[in-house]
Amino acid sequence: MLAAMFGGHALFTISDKTFDRMVEANNGRTGYHIHVSEGMNDVYDSLQNYGRRPIQRLQDHGILGDKTILGHCIHVNTAEMEIIQHTNTMVVNNPESNMGNAIGICPVIQLHKRGILLGMGTDAYTNDMLESIKVALCSQRSQNCLPNVGWCEVTDMLFRNNAKIGEKYFPATLGVLKAGAAADIIVMDYKPFTPFSDENIDCLLYTSPSP
């Protein structure tokens, strides 16, 4: 299966004129992928040069929508979250990249509460998505100063929402093992020291080393 998006880098490298040309060239055929508010420099640049916060600027140019993916969204305020929510725009969290670059933590809990479709990404920082679960969980608990939050949101991002995002571009059912769905299988060298069941899957994912 092949599908395409219209990729832009980040707001601080794209002028208003370029945004308008992107929308004209795309002509509504697909969504956009762009890094947004990954660091505070993105916010400062947008305010200084365009007088608008990043999400507001994207809305002004018609970039947002239900097939657009915003990477990172670390430094977004309440008004920007509302815009993302009302335009049904998607957000992809890249926890290891964000922590490695020391640029902040995506407000996953707050975005999730608004019903925003959140996916799990890597921004090419790692190829170990199970390790990303642990990093995302620890970062959310640290950010919110609560040791009992984040698990449902983080696992949903990887195991449910990534498939939902993919289904917006590919004409197939993804992320499930059933007749008619696209093959979506990984093979792991599992050594059954303990039973593997739906009753202890949370513990196994959180405490086991990645394959």
Task: List each model region and its residues.
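Histidine/acidic residue-rich metal-binding segments in metalloenzymes
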Residues: 1-90, 101-118
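Short, well-ordered secondary-structure micro-motifs
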Residues: 16-17, 44-45, 104, 131-133, ...
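Short secondary-structure capping/turn micro-motifs that flank functional sites
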Residues: 41-42, 100-101, 127-128, 196
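His/Asp/Glu-enriched, well-ordered alpha-helical/loop segment
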Residues: 60-63, 67, 107-192
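Short, acidic/turn-prone active-site loops that include or flank metal/cofactor-
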Residues: 38, 95-100, 123-125
